[in-house]
């Protein structure tokens, strides 16, 4: 039975049962399903403009639940849910996250970056990240201040934590710009950081 059956009562999700495809969801099973699905999509890197993988994951899940889907030319995902009458309701959401982008490769092999969206840059100091190349390779790294240690830089405590005073150190043996370029990393590559 692939018919979508809605027996939800507003503000009363505990007593509801929703049948999507052949998967009955109600009470704690619904909560577990939602939490697990959210964990799955939050584990997929998806800075604004780099959402192809997370959209594909959502599309696959919706289709597994018996829904008809369509992807627009701009990469938006539409999911069609059959209702009990001809009243149409639309919902929208987003699956992109905040992130960074390689602005330039420095002569010492570190990456200068710019923000994608509006992340609070000072909170990213010491954060692990992943650099996604256009060829599909992914490299790990760490977002760091240009002045990381008080015993070396007397202004370390007061140095601004912003895009101009921070960089990404790649977890590869790189000594210069050419080493980084040999990995396939270039300006405009997306950088996603750990949630």
Name the predicted role of every residue range:
Residues 5-195:
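N-terminal hydrophobic/helix-forming segments and targeting peptides
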